[in-house]
Amino acid sequence: MKLLLVEDDEYVAQVLAEAFGSDGHETTIRYTGEDGLAYLTRERPDAVVLDVRLPRLNGVAVLRQIRATDPALPVIIMTGLATPGEIAEARRLGVAEIIEKPQVLRHFSEALARIASRDRLQDAT
């Protein structure tokens, strides 16, 4: 899959991108919500992996803007510190998956498989 990873911690972003690459995914990294949104004006990945805690424009605000232009784009939220309100808002906005940050590497492949399965079901209808 072609992924957009929006994560402000450069080390975490590199580790995740390498792990995703090991699973055969092509990953583009953006370090701010604004840069992630700018990328999405030019490209459409198969899924977005989005940190909730981003500087300036947080992950929920980024998700809100993604939904305004592309309601069907699968978005996986990564969080370690999200508030219950942020989680509720992400769910309301139709986030595909929410993964706790320490568990991202362990549960990421399962999350992508569920997204791919949903896409196949939608294509069949």
Where are the language model's segments positioned?
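Two-component/phosphorelay signaling modules centered on CheY-like receiver
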Residues: 9-28
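Acidic catalytic/metal-coordinating carboxylates
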Residues: 32, 58-61
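Short amphipathic alpha-helix used as the core "switch/output" element in two-component signaling
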Residues: 38, 60-71
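Active-site beta3 strand of CheY-like receiver
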Residues: 43-49, 54
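The feature encodes the CheY-like receiver
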Residues: 55, 83
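C-terminal output helix
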Residues: 85, 103-113
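Short, glycine/charged-rich "phosphate-handling" switch motifs in NTP-dependent
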Residues: 96
